[in-house]
């Protein structure tokens, strides 16, 4: 074996034994660097005769190419080994239980919890979830819901209006309709009736806005409304749905409900619903007692609303209801002040919040 072949074999052995990229770089410098062994051989070619230079130069360059390829291959192997070691050191066991410290484990906000509970209950009854924009037109928020011009709810002190110059047409060719922050989620019902053919069975949860702020009111709050439209729906169906919802939501075997006549522009007849309860100091117990507590409003969809949404009231009828998610959250979980829901106090959230990954189910208990 020639000296060049021995040198090449030794270099390849050093490359194969390099345990990391730093060691491999040291081999490269010792071999191909300015003062490396192969570089030194290349520097001797100038002293040779033309024939020797041609013969020896080809051998040395072949050895250089072989070493260069071996260095590149070993470098890729070492990179893969380094990545595997890094991944192994950073592995997280996702099967480990959550830490108990409130500072290390977050909590689900009561509003998020109740939102999930409500949608779970109505989904079990076959309702879909419909959503719409927070910024609405006067047409969808009021006119198509049978609010006449001059109705108190249209006044500035109740509704957040945008600049009068910012307006949009509800339908092509119609005159512009003023923009506002929706005061209820009922516009979603309007959009649903305009875009879908009956039968319709949806709930409409979302944020709503009114110019009001005290212990039981905030400028932004959450509502969930429901809508059923078909050819044979009646108040008996509405009563059953609300009764089943209250039993499931408050997690009681039975609940007494009281339906009182009321007035809403978009329903006729209109009703307000009270639920029987017992007040025990700072706690409210449902399904027992002699007290009554208002929880929602409802009624049969007004024929004018059906007409304004493109449905024939001689063929279709339906019912709707609405309740405040914030309010029923306060009632169920004993929250005294509505404003606390929006203050972002971590101590309050640690007390009233829920553990993550506990998804509400009817079979497993909504809030267990």
UniProtKB/Swiss-Prot annotation:
Compartments it resides in:
Cytoplasm
**Annotated catalysed reactions:** tRNA(Phe) + L-phenylalanine + ATP = L-phenylalanyl-tRNA(Phe) + AMP + diphosphate + H(+)
Entry keywords, A to Z: Aminoacyl-tRNA synthetase, ATP-binding, Cytoplasm, Ligase, Magnesium, Metal-binding, Nucleotide-binding, Protein biosynthesis
What is this protein's record name? Phenylalanine--tRNA ligase alpha subunit
One GO molecular-function entry: ATP binding
Q: Which residues bind Mg(2+)?
A: 268
Work out whether the entry's keyword set contains Metal-binding.
Answer: yes
> Gene Ontology cellular component?
cytoplasm
Q: How does it assemble?
A: Tetramer of two alpha and two beta subunits.
List the CDD domains.
PheRS_alpha_core
PROSITE patterns the UniProt entry points to:
AA_TRNA_LIGASE_II
Record text on cofactor binding: Binds 2 magnesium ions per tetramer.
A single Gene Ontology biological process assigned to it is: phenylalanyl-tRNA aminoacylation
- Organism the protein comes from: Nitrobacter hamburgensis (strain DSM 10229 / NCIMB 13809 / X14)
E.C. number, please? Answer: 6.1.1.20
Q: Which family does it belong to?
A: Belongs to the class-II aminoacyl-tRNA synthetase family. Phe-tRNA synthetase alpha subunit type 1 subfamily.
Matches recorded under Gene3D superfamilies: Bira Bifunctional Protein, Domain 2 (3.30.930.10)
Q: Which NCBIfam families match?
A: pheS
């Amino acid at each position: 074996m020639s000296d060049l072949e021995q040198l090449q074999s030794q270099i390849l052995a050093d490359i194969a034994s390099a345990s990391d990229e730093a060691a491999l770089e040291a081999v490269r410098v010792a071999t191909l660097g300015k003062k490396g062994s192969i570089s030194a051989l290349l520097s001797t070619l100038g002293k040779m005769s033309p024939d020797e230079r041609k013969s020896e130069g080809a051998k040395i360059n072949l050895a250089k190419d072989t070493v260069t390829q071996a260095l590149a291959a070993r470098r890729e192997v070492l990179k893969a080994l380094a990545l595997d070691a890094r991944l192994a050191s950073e592995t997280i066991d996702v099967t480990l239980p959550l830490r108990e410290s409130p500072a290390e484990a977050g909590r689900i906000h009561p509003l998020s919890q109740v939102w999930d509970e409500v949608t779970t209950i109505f989904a079990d009854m076959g309702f879909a979830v419909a959503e719409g924009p927070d910024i609405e037109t006067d047409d969808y928020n009021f006119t198509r819901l049978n609010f006449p011009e001059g109705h108190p709810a249209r006044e500035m002190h109740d509704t957040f209006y945008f600049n009068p110059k910012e307006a949009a047409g509800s339908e092509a060719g119609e005159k512009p309709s003023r923009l506002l922050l929706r005061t209820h989620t009922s516009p979603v019902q309007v959009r649903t009736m305009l875009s879908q053919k009956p039968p319709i069975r949806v709930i409409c949860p979302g944020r709503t806005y009114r110019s009001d702020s005290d212990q039981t009111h905030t400028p932004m709050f959450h509502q969930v409304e429901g809508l059923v439209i078909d050819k044979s729906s009646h108040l008996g169906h509405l009563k059953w749905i609300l009764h089943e919802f209250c039993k499931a939501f408050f997690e009681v075997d039975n609940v007494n409900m009281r339906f009182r006549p009321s007035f809403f522009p978009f329903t006729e007849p209109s009703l307000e619903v009270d639920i029987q309860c017992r007040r025990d100091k700072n706690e409210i117990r449902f399904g027992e007692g002699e007290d009554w507590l208002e929880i929602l409003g409802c009624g049969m969809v007004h024929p004018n609303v059906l007409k304004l949404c493109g449905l024939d009231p001689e063929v279709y009828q339906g019912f709707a209801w609405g309740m405040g998610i914030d309010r029923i959250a306060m009632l169920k979980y004993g929250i005294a002040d509505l404003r606390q829901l929006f203050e972002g106090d971590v101590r309050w959230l640690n007390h009233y919040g829920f553990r993550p990954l506990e998804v509400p189910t009817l079979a497993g208990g909504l809030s267990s």
